[in-house]
Amino acid sequence: MNVLVYGAGAIGCHIGYCMYATGNVVYLIGRGEHYNQMKRDGMHIRICDNEILKREQVVKEDSMFYIMSDINNIKDVKFDYVFITVKLDDYNEHALQNLYPYMGKNTAVIPPCTKLPFWWFYNLEGESNERFKDVDFDQQLSKYFVRENIICMTMWLSSVIENPGNVCVKHVQRGYPLKEVYPKMKNSADKLRDIFKLTCKSPDVDNIRSEIFIKSINSFAFNTVALDREFNNLQLSQDEYSKDCIRKIMLEGDQILSVLNIPIIQNIEDRISQTLSSTKHTMSMLNDYRKGKQIELDCLWEGFSSVCKILRIDMEFSKYMYEKVMDKVCTRQSSADLNE
């Protein structure tokens, strides 16, 4: 099969590796020095269980693995799967305009999972939810998708680019839980799950909205508190105040599932324990903050804020923590600009 991975970050590289290792043709789209290094010397990937190295490989370009910087250089290829693995700030209309020609009428598309998606209310079951079935709160993105072709996949790995060309998967938690959003893609979703299981984890899931919600609220809660406290996972696990803040954010967010009668498939304590089991991990936004890079917290909060307005729900403590952290980030950026 032909697989396009649009975004050669740490997760995108691991997905590319999983697809290539199971005999599929992979087109990996990257940029910058990371792309240059991979193009020259191949993609070096290490897969660990915290401190234990499980697997290590260098994947170089060949007739089954293409490392590219410009998607427009791909000619006459029909893709079975398209993974969109760019950062949320880059998941925009410009990116989708580039991708659109490669998302055919039968191409399964796996968009980012961290932010509550534009299709959140589509095909939502339950009589009480009928009034929400046509709600679209992100029309700039949704117009590029065939909704029936979407496969939702969440990503539960601690993964990082250690330096250009070198990716380390520090810990695999649940791997890649996935499910079709519409019945049309069931066979494609089942096939994709079987492929992932050959090299990673990909559990069966009953309710994909519950999965993606938990991933999104996890990301928002842990990244917000990590940025506020400037703690890695080990430090968060040892600090009761931090864990209490995480609990409060998750509890507020769970109102969304309750109102829509979506099952809460994992309780809050299990979510906290699962995430903090990656003791060597530092939350991605804290890593970016320390490096002076732009963080994505505003994208996450935008998704929750949009849904809360539609459902008339308050996330007062979450909003307070979000604004507190963004003030901190903006103050640091202003200081950096003055010192340039």
Predicted features, each with a name:
Residues 1, 80, 174:
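Nucleotide donor/acceptor-binding cores
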Residues 1-53:
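NAD(P)+-binding Rossmann beta1-loop-alpha1 motif at the extreme N-terminus of oxidoreductases
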Residues 4, 27, 108-110, 151, ...:
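A structural signal for isolated positions on well-ordered beta-strands in alpha/beta enzyme cores
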Residues 29, 48, 68-71, 153-155, ...:
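Conserved beta-strand termini and adjacent loop/short-helix elements that scaffold enzyme active sites
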Residues 103, 117-127, 168-177, 230-236, ...:
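Helix-loop-beta segment of a Rossmann-like dinucleotide-binding subdomain
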